[in-house]
Amino acid sequence: MNIQALLSDKVSQALIAAGAPAGSEPQVRQSAKAQFGDYQANGVMAIAKKLGMQPRQLAEKVIELLDLDGIASKVEIAGPGFINIFLDRQWVASKVEEALKAPKLGVQPVEPQTIVVDYSAPNVAKQMHVGHLRSTIIGDAAVRTLEFLGHNVIRANHVGDWGTQFGMLIAYLEKMQNENASDMGLSDLELFYQQAKKTYDEDEEFAKRARAYVVKLQSGDEYCRQMWRKLVDITMAQNQIAYDRLNVTLTKDDVMGESLYNTMLPEIVADLKAKGLAVESEGATVVYLDEYKNKDGEPMGVIIQKKDGGYLYTTTDIACAKYRYETLGADRVLYYIDSRQHQHLMQAWTIVRKAGYVPESVPLEHHMFGMMLGKDGKPFKTRSGGTVKLSDLLDEAIERAGKLIAEKNPDMPADELKQVVEAVGIGAVKYADLSKSRTTDYIFDWDNMLALDGNTAPYMQYAYTRVVSVFKRAGIDESNLTLPLVITEDREAALATRLLQFEEIITTVAREGTPHVMCSYLYDLAGLFSSFYEHCQILNADSEESRQSRLKLAMLTAKTLKQGLDTLGIQTVERM
């Protein structure tokens, strides 16, 4: 359940009854400190100012009219007009019981939307590197969260599968008399790419042939299309290995590469011209946007077709947005693309809106993210200054986690050890990223991410094993817990209330695309359980009623930690 939404509704009704205009924002928030209750309504002061009243006077009137019978044990005014709400422990206990029995921890179903999520987007004929990590795992966390809430999510892997590089690769493969591209691994393709680029730069005849192959490919030449398809298939097969290792839900069926929109591009250019949005300028086709100014203060020109007839990324992104609305039926589109692309996307979407391709009622959201940096504060590189391949990074994560887990569990069977090591190693890399606000750069640090304390995956995974170990020791499951839940201790109440805030957290993550909010919540929850575990006897409680109540709190904690980590794409283990 969403306590914040429930209290907001109740406070809003009281505000209106007290004379506030409809739609007044009650600003109900979770309290930062227990002394201020479980929730605070902070909107009274701003509303009182509009009404020409003293804030405390309005707050008193609101409390008088506020119907929280059975929900709150106490409501009080603090400071100049804050309203502190203390939840009734019996009510909290009953809601924990409901959450334990309900599907999805009691999270209410939403009105489902069709939401397109654009993420990962590696290039064909190149191995994935650390630069692809953030888009891939943040986007996948968004997808998992939205699907958990009941939305129809369409994954869109906008791979770079078109352009002059394919002319070079096809020409070079032919030059090497190696048409059997399906036998090559991606490492061979990378080398081919480098050699093709070198030859393209140094050999004008080769460059002409490569450009000719681009034209042939674009005009549908069968041989070129076959070779292109092989290059795409080899790349995506290799990328799938990375996705599977990362526990990311993308498959080959989610590939919607740049080539998908090729047939739309001439139509879009013609349509933008017909609508008077695009004009000819020095042989190119340009859209001038008043919203953006060049260095001379004039409307900025955005090229959508070059002199030679070629199209640009902007043209593709216009087509892409149009396709996602008209063909996929999107109610909302999220783009997990790094912050350096922000202006480019904004310009493309400005054109999309002006042309009427996507109505304003359908949000196009750039969920941008910062860079992964090394300890020196510079972009994360190998020791020699090269790009870090994603596969190498994951290999190292597993190797480091292996040493950590084997040291602590010398007798763990090999099969179990392998599973635990992979979950901890991959989880550590993902959680280190997801636990940081996506809009900022973050420092990649092996020691921090594999630490068994602090806001890390190993700590969270260990916290989960600690909870489930209670049930293993007791030899019981949920069906044995038949007595009603009672809350008598402050630490029980704090844990129970935090457990009931899961829906508020997951709703925020879904709305804002901020998985670090989920990480912070889970870390807080693990800390509250640790305090509860240390100060409240569970298996040796004073009474059977208290024992079962505490086991129920432990049970909901385990379920919430597991579900929360699952929305992040991080696996739990039964022991560490």
From Swiss-Prot:
Superkingdom of origin organism: Bacteria
GO CC, alphabetical: cytoplasm
GO biological process: arginyl-tRNA aminoacylation
Motif 'HIGH' region, residue numbers: 122-132
Transmembrane domains' residue ranges: none
Catalytic reactions on record: tRNA(Arg) + L-arginine + ATP = L-arginyl-tRNA(Arg) + AMP + diphosphate
Subcellular location: Cytoplasm
MF term (GO), any: arginine-tRNA ligase activity
Pfam families assigned to the protein according to its UniProt record, in alphabetical order: Arg_tRNA_synt_N, DALR_1, tRNA-synt_1d
EC assignment: 6.1.1.19
Top-level enzyme category: ligase
Keywords for the protein's UniProt record, in alphabetical order: Aminoacyl-tRNA synthetase, ATP-binding, Cytoplasm, Ligase, Nucleotide-binding, Protein biosynthesis
Main location: cytoplasm
Record family assignment: Belongs to the class-I aminoacyl-tRNA synthetase family.
Assembly with partners or alone: Monomer.
NCBIfam families documented for this protein: argS
Protein name according to UniProt: Arginine--tRNA ligase
Biological source species: Yersinia enterocolitica serotype O:8 / biotype 1B (strain NCTC 13174 / 8081)
Taxonomic path: Bacteria, Pseudomonadati, Pseudomonadota, Gammaproteobacteria, Enterobacterales
